[in-house]
Every structure is written in structure tokens, then in C-alpha cells.
């Protein structure tokens, strides 16, 4: 069984090392990841320049592109390796609620799913680096169950691991996406030349962390698994939209 692994934090990140190390105990692994941090690039493709694929001393491959680029290259370049599954992560920081629309970690899994490959995105609800032991232990539990009876149908799962001590993880919950408030305004500044520049402001506060949401359950110490879908059609609004446009 072959697993292609990518992320958006780059091939040198601690999270992808943990994910590759644990997954290798269950399957054949190939890592194709961005050469640097590409957080927040969502499903973007590199179209304005050619891409290069290189191999690091640890055996990981890296690309001067986005996570989505990495999935395309990983599935196209290697004649000796075709993925049965794609794993993305482990992201340094959560990917919950609206974050999933921006996340390169989730995007790598999404791109694989669009190719017909079952895919899982993994994130740790912590950016401090204090809880990698929790992430690794959780991953052992998750993958032991996953590979015992691997999913047969196409899946796209978003998994978030709580920022608690390993012994304090309370189990697994299936959760829906929560919501954030609108992000904060851009921050104006001046560069050393006195020119006007702008920084994108911080993300908004969580507005929906009710029981059953990824924000709520992961914050309470549970590993959350959220099944995602690609179809963005608002089916309940179809009739109202047709009436507005006087269309069928």
C-alpha cells in the first residue's frame, strides 16, 4: 500500500517528519512537499513558471511550488509509485472551520480527492511546538485503526489533534466545521524606504464553538474528524435563486 505525503509547512517541518515516520510503519511512503512554508495558499497552482523537483538527504522530495503542485507532481513523475492514499500534514496549528478554505494542508488532500484518491489532512491545534508527542501518539492510534480496514470509497477527512498532554486526549469525535468572525482589518505600515505597505490582519475570533463543532470538541480535548465535500452548491437556495432570475 502506497501513501503520498505532503503539507504546506514545507519539507523540513516537524509535522511532516512525524507523519512520514509513523505512516511508514503501516505502508510505503513517499514525501513530496513544498521547499518552504506555503501556509494559506489554499488550492493555488503555480502557472507562471516551471517547477523543480529535488530530493533532500533524508529522502524527502521537495518542490518550489504549492501543496497542490506537489500532489500533481507526486502522482505524475514517479513511475514506481502511485498513491493509494494521500496524507497531508501534520500542520503546525489547527485547520478548523473557515480555516479549511485557506489551508494548503487541506488543499493537498482536496486535490488528491479530486484525482480520485482517498485523502486525509492532519493538523495539531497548537503552533508553539509543545505537543508533538501528543500528535505522534494520536497518529499511532488513528493509523492503526485506519489501516486495519482501510476505507474503500473515496474519502476526504479533516482531522485536528488537541493541544493537550498525550494522556489527556479524550478520544475521537466526528464534528462539523465551526465558524470564525471576520478577520481583522489590514494593518498599514511603512517600509524602510518610507513606502506604504500593508499586512493582512490576524484571523477573527471563533464565533461558533458549540458542542459538535471542530472548534468545540478539539478545544475540549478530543481528536476531531470532519468529512469534507467539494460541491459548494447551496442546494437549499436553488429555488429562491431561480425565482430571482426568473429562470428554471
UniProtKB/Swiss-Prot annotation:
A divalent metal cation binds at residues 8-9, 39, 91. This is 5'-nucleotidase SurE. It is an enzyme of class 3 (hydrolase). Belongs to the SurE nucleotidase family. It comes from Neisseria meningitidis serogroup C (strain 053442). GO terms for molecular function: 3'-nucleotidase activity; 5'-nucleotidase activity; exopolyphosphatase activity; metal ion binding; nucleotide binding. Its cofactor is a divalent metal cation. Its main location: cytoplasm. InterPro entries: SurE (IPR030048), SurE-like_Pase/nucleotidase (IPR002828), SurE-like_sf (IPR036523). Keywords: Cytoplasm, Hydrolase, Metal-binding, Nucleotide-binding. One of its GO terms (cellular component) is cytoplasm. Binds 1 divalent metal cation per subunit. It is found in: Cytoplasm. Nucleotidase that shows phosphatase activity on nucleoside 5'-monophosphates. It catalyses: a ribonucleoside 5'-phosphate + H2O = a ribonucleoside + phosphate. SUPFAM superfamilies: SurE-like (SSF64167). It holds the Pfam family SurE. Its EC number is 3.1.3.5.
